Regions:
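Short, charged, intrinsically disordered terminal tails
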Residues: 1, 115-133
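Short beta-strand elements
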Residues: 30-34, 103-110
Length: 133
């Protein structure tokens, strides 16, 4: 963005980080990224002193005055995916336009998985215990 007083350049990583944070704010988003991205993120989180990657699952294309965003998410089970996608779009567009002044031309959302609360529970049963005979 250029003015008579100088030029402001916003790095793609800044735009991606803002989009990632705005996506996480929406109720119904369990995680960002596909399974491989989340696996790498989980490994990074275990390294002492490693910083959280707020742009995980987000890719952007940034021009002089416009930006396009792609977001990969895991939705919580029971949430309307259409409503969730609409909420993500609204929040990402509002955050980016307010914070950067860029016009957001599109926010594409890919839902890679649905999170079930039971996926994290470990009640001690084995797969043999869960078989129907």
């Amino acid at each position: 963005m250029s003015t008579e007083r100088g030029k402001t350049t916003i790095a793609d990583t800044v735009v991606a980080k803002i989009a990632g944070l705005a996506t996480r704010e929406v109720a119904g988003v369990h995680a960002l990224g596909g399974s491989a991205t989340r696996a790498v993120g989980a490994l990074r989180d275990r390294i002492p002193g490693a910083s959280v990657n707020h742009a995980q699952g987000v890719s952007v294309e940034v021009g002089e005055k416009q930006a396009a965003v792609d977001v990969d998410i895991v939705a919580e089970y029971g949430v309307s995916i259409n409503d969730l996608a609409g909420g993500i779009r609204r929040n990402v567009i509002a955050a980016l336009e307010r914070m950067t002044g860029l016009e957001v031309v599109e926010v594409n959302i890919t839902v890679h998985d649905v999170y079930l609360a039971d996926d994290d529970s470990d009640d001690g049963r084995t797969s043999d215990d869960l078989r129907v005979v």
